[in-house]
Amino acid sequence: RGVPMIHLSTPGVAGLIGGSREDSPPAPWGAYEESKAEAESILQSVLPPELLTILRPDFVYGPGDRHKLSLFRQVRRGWFPLVGLGGAKLRPTFAGDVSRAVLASLPGGILGPGLWNIGGPEVVSVAELVRAVAAAEGVRLATIPVPRVIFGIALALGPLAPRQLSRSRLQLFGKDHWVDIARASDAGFHPETGLADGLSRTVSWYKSEGLL
């Protein structure tokens, strides 16, 4: 108590929706998101508002991150299964911009106490994202539209299902889920790294580490 806290949460607390705002009602869609929602609630119950900053960075990628590595590796193979036509929207956010948001949340920074959505400058479709990844990797990519019903059949196979047709892929790449960053923008915080630049830097790091 008495010490400011910055908590990194997730937009998934508000569910899989497009344009979620800081005041969107909670609707966590998975165990991870439920744990983050509970953490937010606990912190809000024990800390006074002036000591708590909660950041919800959206779809984070960048050097040092391995959570999105499977996406980059799948694109590297030259083909990528899309949920439907890959039209679901998301907002990729470069890790460096998340670090900037944390610094901006320190005492005296432009992001004061409260809840803030943090996102990249572009909202793109899944199809646009994987093509941008392919461009950064310098590979030709074939995108394969997979009807939702096929994903459903694959999920019914359980452990026998191809990992490219997983439940998490259906959820993350099959529905709009991106944040509205107007509140942070109004406070003067703006993302600096665009998608093409961020992906190029990420691919370079993966290659330098022998991961691609």
List where the protein language model places each region.
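Short-chain dehydrogenase/reductase
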Residues: G18, P28-E40, Y61, D65, ...
